[in-house]
Amino acid sequence: MFLRNRYNYLALVFVSYFIFIIYSIFSLQILNSDETIKRIDQQTLDVFYLTPPRGEIYDTNNEKLATSSLEPHLFINLRKINKDNIDQYKQYLKYNFQELKNSDLEEIFSSKEILYLVRNINDLDYLERQALQELDAFEIFDYPIREYTYMNIASHIIGYIGKPTSEDFEEFPNTIKTGIVGKSGVEKYYENQLSGKAGEVVFKGDEIVDFILPESGEDLYLTIDIETQIVATESLLEGIKLANENFESENIIQKGSVVVIDVDTGEVLTMVSLPDFDPNKFVKGISSFDFNQLNRIEAFNNFAIQGLYPPGSVFKVVAYWLAENEGLFPDGISSRSNRMKCEGNLSFSFIDGSQQVYNDWKEDGHGNVNLSSAIQQSCNVYFWDIALKIWRTYEGNENESILQEYARNLGFGKVTGIDLPFEKSGVVPDRDLFEEWTITRPELVRPEGWLGGDLMNLIVGQGAITTTPMQVASAYKTLLTGYSSAPYLDKNIDSVQKVKNYDINDDFIEFLLSDLNLVTNKDGTAYFAFEVLGRKANDIGGKTGTAQNPGDKNNTSWFAGVDSISNPKYVIVTVVDEGGSGSAVAAPISRRIIQHLIGEDLTPVKFGEITE
């Protein structure tokens, strides 16, 4: 009896345990079946991402520079293509879209994508589009088309777009592989802002089960004034044409740049680089021939921030500042007003007794000059004498690089920080750099290293120094305000960080403006270029520069100026690579741009007097 009850008890326990197991399984498979099915479904869903429209780009006056329009595009659902219908679809595409080559068809039907974008069908009428949709594998979706309103104008500022590369995916992780990405200019720099959020076409198997619209990118408002940009581009083209007509050069003169920045804020009003390109050519894919042609003439280089040139005499304002601030004037001169005799050359003795002679650009000399007239007439001898004094006073000690420190204080030798990609820093040479180059780039330096002659080259903007037009504009801005700040293009930038330069005071700024004004008036190197302005020239200032290039290359033409002496608003810098004399080419170009800035009627760019 006891044994039988024990067996009954064990049986009851076993049955209870079995019922519990069955209930648990039932709960998982039946009671939670909705969640289970949902989870299984999710595991079989695939997503194709649709490219979103990019944000619009506007100039400072809300003029549209770049826009995106949605146009119907034909896509093919490759999951509905099989061995039974592939030839039918190939023949259909080949017959109806005759621009498609056999290689295009092979690319389409060998793709691993779910959907493949075949072409824009904006040229088809309603009935033709309906006919396409009767074929099961065809889908029609809106796809954004980028359009650049002003074509080549401001192309280096705006940039262009293209298919993403592995480098793009690394830099912008949210980029979709079937999308587009900014390749240069603000299109690249502000990619995350402009790109938007991709749409989604959700597939279960070969059927579309959900669709999420893409979201447009944010709009971008620039500091650029497109009207000034057009005037600056036209003026630079006129000047380059004149340079080709008046100078003999081994190369066709075609490279140049113009920069106009706000003296107070650093806003970039205009930035031109030539040769340029039409970014619209990249929207549907540029041909290899066209790309190679543009690449050959360096049309994709933004010479305003990537062109590295010796600055020539526009660099003399650095020595001007140093002389004023440190009291470092030529031998026997104790102030800015004292004069020295310039006879057209500077001669001095080496330790071994041999003579070195430096010849000024003006063979018969400038006569009696002080700091003001040395800037006005661009007297090399005056500044060479300052370099010689620095060398003899400081050779071998920590102050030997005092000129270089003043240059770096103005931003030479480092990027300005403008909101554009690929900016270059340039070079401010000194003893340490030459020692480094002796090891790394021995072809650039002499075995004896840094010498006094290198300092004399540097003080007049020659030798190993290289700089960009934007650096020169930024340096002049600092000298004219006493504050340094990065130039910028985004009009809605959160804040502009201004750094006070305590070595630049109001008296210095007043002296500099007055002396720059001498350059554009009687006896100044830019007088002929600005003579057409008459009395208006009394309120304009600048500095010409003619920089020698190595080998058989023609000189580089420079002008750096300000639109008003009494109330400076803009700094203007013009460079023409191999353009010759700064007073003959760059100054007349700048004059026409200044005419626009001050509201004067425009007159043609006229070849100026060759000085320097």
List where the protein language model places each region:
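Periplasmic/cell-envelope proteins involved in peptidoglycan metabolism and beta-lactam response
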Residues: 1-286, 401-409, 553, 575-612
